[in-house]
Regions:
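Hydrophobic, mid-to-C-terminal alpha-helical segments
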Residues: 200-253, 263-273
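Short, intrinsically disordered/low-complexity patches at protein termini
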Residues: 127-128, 134, 253, 274-278
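Short, charged low-complexity intrinsically disordered segments located at boundaries
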Residues: 130-136, 215-220, 241, 256-264, ...
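Extended, charge-rich alpha-helical regions
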Residues: 146-166, 256, 261-285
């Protein structure tokens, strides 16, 4: 109901599109948030949590699980203008900024630009073995379907998840703890920030910035994620678009923060300082 109210309040339908193309449907919102991340920082093995904190991504881990409102996101995409990178609303222009990225979902925005290589020193299979301790099997062909576990830097998410069962063994050596931490990091980055249209695969390319793991806090992940979001919003604003990726939870939380009359119930948890990101204030409905 709230999404419908927002659509009525914010959307002025393009009449040419309405009569020539028909009313566009809802966009498919690509987002992956695995069950083992739902417990946040407090629900994680403290050995893994320590490494994620050292990587500077503990704020993102604190963001609670929420279902995406496809209607809300579609309504906002309808008002997105690629030429200005902003939402054109009846009362003026608004956009999502780096401040929103840091304050709402706790992603660091200060540091070096996220610029690396797209081809590893040897092969992505070797890189996966080095960073995560597991080597994907060789390419297999089943009929006309490519069943390869790894394509470039992208690994089948289910295969990778099966390599890291919960819980972490009590007597796990530090090398295994670091591999688990890198797995959680790549799941957070690939599922919450840099989600693309290939929902069954996840890229390990980001792990080059976490060698060692503490090196990750030197980079502005918020800047990279915001650029990725702008790209997906621009692509999704095309009339032929059917789906959208990127940090869509930020888009939803941004709308809740900017239009409080449509947000669900807010909570004010009793927590020790420093407080977590703004996202923890919302109870998804």
């Amino acid at each position: 109901m709230k999404s419908s109210l927002l659509c009525g309040a914010l959307i002025i339908i393009n009449t040419k599109l309405l009569y020539l193309q028909g009313v566009p449907g809802l966009l498919t919102c690509r987002h992956r948030d695995k069950d083992f991340l739902h417990g946040g920082l407090d629900g994680l093995d403290p050995r893994i949590a320590a490494y994620i904190t050292d990587a500077g991504l503990d704020g993102l881990l604190r963001v609670p699980h929420m279902d995406l409102d496809h209607a809300l996101i579609t309504a906002l995409v309808e008002r997105w203008r690629p030429e200005t990178h902003s939402f054109h609303l009846p009362h003026g222009e608004m956009t999502i900024t780096l401040q929103d990225m840091e304050v709402i979902i706790g992603v660091p925005v200060h540091g070096l630009p996220v610029v690396g290589y797209t081809s590893p020193r040897t092969s992505w299979s070797n890189a996966c073995a080095e960073w995560l301790g597991c080597r994907p099997p060789d390419r297999q062909l089943g009929g006309n379907k490519n069943t390869a576990v790894m394509e470039g830097p992208r690994v089948k998410a289910k295969w990778l998840e099966d390599r890291f069962p919960n819980p972490l063994p009590v007597d796990a050596p530090d090398a295994l703890v670091q591999q688990y931490a890198r797995f959680y990091i790549v799941e957070m980055l690939g599922g919450r920030l840099f989600m693309d249209k290939g929902g069954d695969r996840i890229s390990i390319m980001y792990l080059q910035f976490f060698d060692p793991i503490s090196n990750g806090k030197r980079y502005s992940w918020g800047s990279a994620a915001l650029s990725w979001l702008y790209r997906h919003l621009c692509n999704a604003s095309e009339k032929t678009a059917k789906q959208i990726g990127g940090p869509l939870l930020l888009v939803q939380l941004w709308a809740w923060a900017r239009f409080p009359h449509i947000c669900p119930v807010m909570r004010h948890p009793q927590q020790a300082l420093p407080p977590g990101p703004l996202a923890i204030r919302y109870v998804a409905c």
